[in-house]
Design a protein with these regions (language model features):
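Feature captures C-terminal
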Residues: 1-180
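Primary recognition of N-terminal secretory signal peptides and signal-anchoring hydrophobic helices
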Residues: 177-250
Length: 250
């Protein structure tokens, strides 16, 4: 933590608190039907992505920025606009919120130690560190279709490095065929060698190999060839005809 920030406290109304929460929730993009993941607004870098302790709340990503914060409670009661809360933030965030007109109060307290020094002291006292999750907030309004086999295929391609999942835009099942077309052809190997670069394991755990990658390997060749799978590798041998069994029709 390289910045010399200190902590401030400031009184805010419930309305100001919810405005601050909406400001932070704008870090996400609005979820669209068919999105396989959530994505992030590139105009709102990660250091603006604040979370809030002491409140329970939901972030509905099916709604546009500014309308996402729902069901906010404080100490078990709904947070109303006229409630008064004590907010603790660092001096950088306080100044930004004031400049944007999100909060209006003046600081009431300032820490004598920097955030950096407080972190060092806390970590020294809690070694090993055992972080706990508050479970005080959740994302709603999304259906990631986790049981959809097409989604499983896209996730597998991302996890194996075959397909990029942009930070600022989710892959979407409505453009599934187009997304698959983004996966580059891979030349598996030279002839008479083996390779795994173009293979992947599908959602059912079985190995798969793309026919178009095999075609790319043999582009321009008139040789006979044999293809086999052994020890997690596709073996491609030329000058011998295919000696495997015919695949059954679906």
């Amino acid at each position: 933590y390289k910045y010399p920030n200190v902590l401030y406290t400031v009184k805010v109304s419930g309305a100001e608190m919810k405005a601050y929460m909406e400001w932070a929730a704008a870090c996400w993009n609005q979820w669209k039907e068919g999105d396989v993941s959530i994505s992030f607004n590139p105009q709102k870098p990660g250091y603006l992505h604040d979370h809030f302790i002491g409140l329970n709340y939901e972030v509905n990503l099916s709604k546009p920025a500014g309308e996402r914060i729902e069901n906010v409670t404080f100490q078990g009661k709904p947070l109303t606009d006229d409630m008064t809360l004590t907010l603790c933030v660092n001096d950088y965030r306080y100044t930004g919120l004031k400049n944007e007109g999100i909060i209006s109060g003046e600081k009431e307290w300032e820490s004598s130690a920097s955030v950096r020094d407080m972190l060092v002291a806390y970590l020294a006292e809690h070694d090993p560190l055992e972080p706990a999750v508050d479970h005080n907030w959740k994302i709603t309004g999304v259906d990631l279709q986790k049981d959809n086999p097409d989604r499983a295929t896209l996730i597998e391609l991302v996890n194996t490095g075959r397909l990029e999942s942009p930070y600022s835009q989710s892959l979407n099942l409505d453009t599934y065929s187009e997304v698959l077309g983004m996966v580059d052809n891979v030349k598996v190997s030279d002839l008479d060698k083996t390779g795994t670069a173009a293979s992947f394991v599908g959602a059912d755990g079985a190995p798969y190999f793309r026919m178009r990658d095999l075609a790319y390997t043999f582009n321009g060749s008139k040789n006979q060839f044999n293809v086999s799978w052994a020890d997690g590798k596709v073996a491609i041998t030329t000058s011998t005809a295919y000696d495997g069994e015919l695949f059954p029709l679906p």
